[in-house]
Structures are given as C-alpha cells and as structure tokens.
Amino acid sequence: MDELVVKDLIDRLIDLSFAEDIGDGDHTTLSCIPADAMGKSKLLIKEEGILAGIEVAKEVFRRFDPTMKVEVFIQDGTHVKPGDVAMVVEGKVQSLLQTERLMLNIMQRMSGIATMTNKYVKKLEGTKTRVLDTRKTTPGMRIMEKMAVKIGGGGNHRIGLFDMILLKDNHVDFAGGIHNAVSRAKEYCKAKVRT
C-alpha cells in the first residue's frame, strides 16, 4: 500500500481518537495543570515482548503538539523486557497528559499483536510456512494492526477488498458455483486491465 495512503489513514485515526477522547478539552488537566508547566515522561516497559508502535506514537505527539520532544531508545521490532525504557517525551505537561492514553493504547495493542505474531513465526522457523494476517481486524485499526504483524515478523496478505481477488465460499455460492465464480472473476480482471 502507498506510504501516503498509510500516513493519511493513521493521521485520520489519530484525529478521530483525539476527538473521541479529548473532545472539547481534557477538563481535569486543563483545570489543575498550569498551561506553561513543562515536564518529562518515560515509556517504561512492563511486560516481555516485541515492541511495536513507536513510529505511530511519535506521530500522536507531533500531531497534538509539535513542540513535544521525543527521544527513542528502543525501535519497533525489538525484544523488550520489564524495566526497559522505550522512549522519553518532554514538553508541556498538559500535552503529555492528554496524549498518554492514546499513545499507550496504540502501543499496547500493536506490541501485543507483534509479540503474538513473533511467537508463531519462531515456532515455524525451519519450515516453508509463513505467518500472514487477514482482514479480520478492528475497525479503523487495520493499518496499525497490519503494521504490527510485519513488525512481529509476519507478512500482510491483503489490505482490503481492493487489492486482490479472493474467492470465498459465499462468493462461490452466490455466483452459482466455483466455475461461474472463477470465469466471472477472470472476465472482470480482463475488463479492469483494458480500462
């Protein structure tokens, strides 16, 4: 998938997440933290696994407050253990508090997927079998979940309905059998190539 399309999808998810979580403002933070208060926070690893989501987290911070400074110590795809510090973020305390939950939710989900994928990849080492993902993803999170699979050592099968024909039982049934489904798919592809 085109990098610009991926970036756009991630940006839209981040914006939607801000709207969902912050709305017209984090009233707790805005009410008790001075606007000019500066601080620093660190992402401390609590479980062993494969780290994923650092690049998305950096984008969360950048989109919310471009003045935030992020120092990354551990890259996506790295095996981590409790006590490791993945990154330190410095900036306005209001910005730190308003972005922390979104960053944590994204990184926990992506790291969980990358860790599980990596376990399967390791079990299959030495065979000719590859771990591939599916379209059975969380609505709105597909791109990030598929990124996590790749970070964990797996591969992406297809992103959506637009990038590959995959005849399944429902297609075969509604087309009136496998022969009809295959021949119609071939005709469709020929027509698509001509246009």
Where are the predicted features?
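Acidic/glycine-rich phosphate/pyrophosphate-binding loops and surrounding catalytic core
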Residues: D2-T195
